[in-house]
Regions:
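Structural signature of the two symmetry-related core transmembrane helices
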Residues: 101-116
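A late C-terminal transmembrane helix in Major Facilitator Superfamily
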Residues: 152-197
Length: 217
């Protein structure tokens, strides 16, 4: 009987402890986390950049003198460069505590790619700019997905961060192609849209540096 009473008392104390700890965990709101917002902004801007590239890259290249067939092949080359980079970056990101260097590589590839499209229009150089855009897009997309796990402590937090970042991020990204199409119509060239994309890529870099810190939401 004494052993049974001790076991019952111990079980009761454990239950009390669990009941105290559980509400404390529920009080944390992911919407109040600056780190969560940095992940969300990074997610949204990298998606916006990708959607704009897929939507308008052929038109940009055609206006620079390529045929529609050549422009289509350039878009295919970009995606061929993007796909293996996603897997490569995922492996690297999972083995480092901070992803600062990966964020910088991805964003700088995109910025250099846009600068190249803006300033140098030869066929061979354009292939280089397109490959850089693909590599950069692979890095940024992979990191935006990895941050859901890397910046959280458990599956529940990861699910909440993913829901926040993807709902707001894709909503933000959806306006990108329309906005840059409007800029083109207003200026009748792709100079201002490309300059704006360089600016967006710079903001994406800054938010990525914040999101890549070895912290949790």
């Amino acid at each position: 009987m004494a052993v049974d009473n001790m076991a019952a008392d111990t079980l009761e104390e454990v239950n009390k402890t669990n009941n105290i700890d559980e509400p404390t965990m529920k009080e944390v709101s992911i919407w109040k986390s600056s780190l969560a917002w940095q992940v969300t902004i990074y997610m949204g801007l990298q998606s916006m950049i990708f959607y704009c590239i897929v939507t308008w890259l052929p038109s940009i290249l055609i206006q620079q003198g390529m045929t529609s067939s050549q422009a289509g092949w350039m878009l295919s080359i970009m995606q061929l460069a993007l796909i293996p980079t996603i897997f490569f970056c995922s492996i690297l990101a999972g083995h480092t505590s901070s992803q600062h260097s990966l964020v910088m590589v991805g964003s700088l590839c995109i910025i250099i790619g846009f600068l190249g499209l803006l300033l140098v229009h030869s066929f061979k150089s354009t292939i280089l700019w397109i490959i850089l855009l693909g590599i950069g897009g692979g890095f940024t997309f992979s990191l935006s997905m990895m941050f859901f796990n890397l910046r959280t402590n458990n599956a529940n937090e990861a699910a909440r961060l993913s829901g926040m970042a993807q709902s707001i991020g894709y909503l933000l990204a959806a306006f990108g192609p329309m906005f840059f199409g409007y800029l083109h119509d207003a200026t009748n060239n792709w100079t201002m849209p490309l300059i704006t994309l360089i600016g967006v890529s710079s903001v994406c870099l800054l938010s990525g540096l914040g999101a890549s810190r070895n912290l949790s939401v």
